[in-house]
Structures are given as C-alpha cells and as structure tokens.
Amino acid sequence: MSTAEQRLRLMQLASSNLPVGGYSWSQGLEWAVEAGWVPDVAAFERWQRRQMTEGFFTVDLPLFARLYRACEQGDIAAAQRWTAYLLACRETRELREEERNRGAAFARLLSDWQPDCPPPWRSLCQQSQLAGMAWLGVRWRIALPEMALSLGYSWIESAVMAGVKLVPFGQQAAQQLILRLCDHYAAEMPRALATPDGDIGSATPLAAIASARHETQYSRLFRS
C-alpha cells in the first residue's frame, strides 16, 4: 500500500462518519454538566485534559501499543490478555458497554474491509475497537504512531462535539478546543506509547462517578 493510500485510510479511520457510534456516548460528561462540574468552555477544557492525561494516556494508548505489537507478532493470547485488561480498566457498566458496542460496530466494518480476517481475531475485535484498530493498522502496514494519531483525533473530536451539545458552546469555540487539545495530545503521545506495564491504569474518579450516575440520569441525550 502506498503512503498516499495509507494517509487516506488514516483519515477514514479518524472520520466522524465512521459508523462505530463514537458520538452516541458522552463518557460521563452529560451527568458532569448537569451536576455543575462542567459549566462552561474553560471547565470543559480542564475536564477533557484531565481525561486525556489521567486516562487516555495511561490506559488507552499504552494498551493500544501492546495490542498493536501483539498483532504484529500474531500473538492472539497476548492480544486477548490486553483486551481483557482494557475492559477491566473501564470502571462502569456504561463504559464497558461502550467499549463492546464500538468493538462490535468496528468488527462489522472489518468484515467488509478485510473478509479474510481469521475468526479468532475477528471475535477479539468485537470486544474492543482498540483491538480492531490495532489489527487493521498492522494489516494495512500503517505504523503505530500514525495509528495512535488517528485514534487520538477521533477521541478528541467526539468529546468536543459532545461538549457542543451539552455545555454548550459554538462551533468556533469547538475548533479552538480541538486545536489546543490536539497540540497537547501530539506533545505527550510518544511518552504515553512508551508507558511501562506497571504504570498502566487510570486516575479519574470523578469521571467514573459521572459515568455511573449517568446510567440512571432521568433525561439524557447520550446512550447508557
């Protein structure tokens, strides 16, 4: 696959039109807004930076790197172990459901894009979108850092678009937020990918509480 094709594939994976349900979940933000924890744009940016620093950089990216390497080596046992670890790090039923739902949706795309994906790997990808992204990145020969950029941009854009609906704020403010959050992501991503095993784990108790409370929130825009 040429470099141009690989870049276009990365754009497709980061696209908001990718039908994996990324815009259906707020990861607790909806309850945090109702509780008054995130009343404005500045508070939203602080909230999202904290989720990135204490969650995405310490759980998602380190585990994505391990899943990618397991896929490179064809080590299904290691990939299963790290996927189970990822699900264990999702601290609420809502977050685990999101992970599995997005994984199942991505696996359906994977079946169309790569119908020769072996059944054990396809079954694993149904449990987590990270596993599917890792397998596909290896199959398409896209390097880990580039896949991590696509993954991060998709996560940032989904979070900001949830903020537009909930906080709320306008599209111009949203684009400024995406710019600043992407700069922070790009600066810290290499360190996150190199996280040692012993440092994997989240430290976002308020986000976990918000997600748990969102499960029974009376009026909701986002899934639970």
From Swiss-Prot:
Any single Gene Ontology cellular-component annotation: cytoplasm
GO molecular function: nickel cation binding
Magnesium among keywords: no
Domain of life where this protein originates: Bacteria
Gene3D superfamilies: Urease accessory protein UreF
Major subcellular site: cytoplasm
Keyword annotations of the record: Chaperone, Cytoplasm, Nickel insertion
InterPro entries linked to this entry: UreF, UreF_sf
Protein name (database record): Urease accessory protein UreF
Origin organism lineage: Bacteria, Pseudomonadati, Pseudomonadota, Gammaproteobacteria, Enterobacterales
